[in-house]
Amino acid sequence: MRALLSVSDKEGIVEFGKELENLGFEILSTGGTFKFLKENGIKVMEVSDFTKSPELFEGRVKTLHPKIHGGILHKRSNENHIKQAKENEILGIDLVCVNLYPFKKTTIMSDDFDEIIENIDIGGPAMIRSAAKNYKDVMVLCDPLDYEKVIETLKKGQIDENFRLNLMIKAYEHTANYDAYIANYMNERFNGGFGASKFIVGQKVFDTKYGENPHQKGALYEFDAFFSANFKALKGEASFNNLTDINAALNLASSFDKAPAIAIVKHGNPCGFAIKENLVQSYIHALKCDSVSAYGGVVAINGTLDEALANKINEIYVEVIIAANVDEKALAVFEGKKRIKIFTQESSFLIRSFDKYDFKHIDGGFVYQNSDEVGEDEFKNAKLMSQREASKEELKDLEIAMKIAAFTKSNNVVYVKNGAMVAIGMGMTSRIDAAKVAIAKAKEMGLDLQGCVLASEAFFPFRDSIDEASKVGVKAIVEPGGSIRDDEVVKAADEYGMALYFTGVRHFLH
């Protein structure tokens, strides 16, 4: 038996090589891997000695040789293949263990294009693909996590086809991922990220019980190991819908730096939000906005879930808590609650990935765009359009309202008072309806809107929403502006003595 080992990631390769040697494998290797194995006492033959052909062009050509690919690709059950192999002195290679040049790591560490180009692996993917194609005769490995499993299987002497099949699938996933990253990088560097093709590649984290509905299948996939590093289940398992709501809640609660922010989300939209002097007070005020919708919702905590906050949350049923951190006493509070799910990022404050791009599936394809972010200076650069300026406290509330609006389904309007959301209308086909629905809900909750501020994610097309806001005592408004009737909106604000600011940036969310 013969194995070819050629790896960039040397983790576990010595132990793996020794086990193969003990099992009677002749080991071939290249360059740095050959040297590393030899230094660690493993009997190994360099590929150039095996092929009788030297490495060429500063190592660019090492394994691209008929004796390598013929040794991998010929079918052991095909008499014609066996005959050709003998005639051409091609020896079988029964196991291929390859992982690839660190292209992605190089692009992160360096902007030198020559260096980046040299870290595009050619021979490695070719060997992986060859071995995967002939998976019935050749075992292919590209992940150090599989070394132990393969050795155990080899020792048992019973290598079923399903085991080989899974290694084959993993190999093609690996090379596809590698090539996709290269293509995306080149398009990012030379075509602004929008080339003729776009590859979206994620790694599975786990299967969900089902998708959005019980008859659908679902799973969570991640970019750059984000969830593996920043999402730990402490109680319960996340469903598909939990994950989308967690995403919405986390995005909002994490948008205020280190502030003790609490966001409550239901079906992707905020039904509560507050920033008060501490997290307990933030939760109390966030819940007031719509305690009915908060039932069974998702609570995001920009800080630590402690015992006091846990006791307060435990007064009603919430389905999910996502917190930057969770202490043991807080977990104990929920021991008797079977249905609640608790997740943490094990950090001081909530963490976002800040993915640069966003996409949505549409029938027959997908639409792809730069991610929408509320700019750091977006509110600071907002232009005062009215005669009246907002007070210092109103400005704080306006910024909160503006950010909530940016994370809420269009059309929306958001009312904030003293650091807490007091009313919200979202997902409406007209902005005036959103304004009216928000006010009606606030009245139902017994909330006083007098002195609050108002934000909208897009411009007001008419003055009607301003007229409506005046009836409940709105003192200041922030919106993008850009309507052909902006002058009417400004006039209405001045009539009611409101402060009005235009940011110049729209935040539609569909």
UniProtKB/Swiss-Prot annotation:
Cite the Gene3D superfamilies for this sequence: 3.40.140.20, Methylglyoxal synthase-like domain (3.40.50.1380)
What CDD domains does UniProt report for this protein, alphabetically? IMPCH (cd01421)
Q: What reactions does this protein catalyze?
A: (6R)-10-formyltetrahydrofolate + 5-amino-1-(5-phospho-beta-D-ribosyl)imidazole-4-carboxamide = 5-formamido-1-(5-phospho-D-ribosyl)imidazole-4-carboxamide + (6S)-5,6,7,8-tetrahydrofolate; IMP + H2O = 5-formamido-1-(5-phospho-D-ribosyl)imidazole-4-carboxamide
Q: Which UniProt keywords apply?
A: Hydrolase, Multifunctional enzyme, Purine biosynthesis, Transferase
Query: Family, per the entry?
Result: Belongs to the PurH family.
According to the entry, every stretch annotated as the MGS-like domain falls at 1-142
Q: Does the keyword S-adenosyl-L-methionine apply?
A: no
Q: In which pathway does it act?
A: Purine metabolism; IMP biosynthesis via de novo pathway; 5-formamido-1-(5-phospho-D-ribosyl)imidazole-4-carboxamide from 5-amino-1-(5-phospho-D-ribosyl)imidazole-4-carboxamide (10-formyl THF route): step 1/1; Purine metabolism; IMP biosynthesis via de novo pathway; IMP from 5-formamido-1-(5-phospho-D-ribosyl)imidazole-4-carboxamide: step 1/1
Q: What is this protein called?
A: Bifunctional purine biosynthesis protein PurH
As one GO molecular function, the record gives: IMP cyclohydrolase activity
Q: Which HAMAP family match?
A: PurH
Domain-related comment: The IMP cyclohydrolase activity resides in the N-terminal region.
Instruction: Give EC number(s), comma-separated.
Output: 2.1.2.3, 3.5.4.10
Q: List the record's Gene Ontology CC terms alphabetically.
A: cytosol
Q: Which gene encodes it?
A: purH
KW DNA damage (keyword) present: no
Q: Which organism is it from?
A: Campylobacter jejuni (strain RM1221)
A single Pfam family it belongs to is AICARFT_IMPCHas
> GO terms for biological process?
'de novo' IMP biosynthetic process
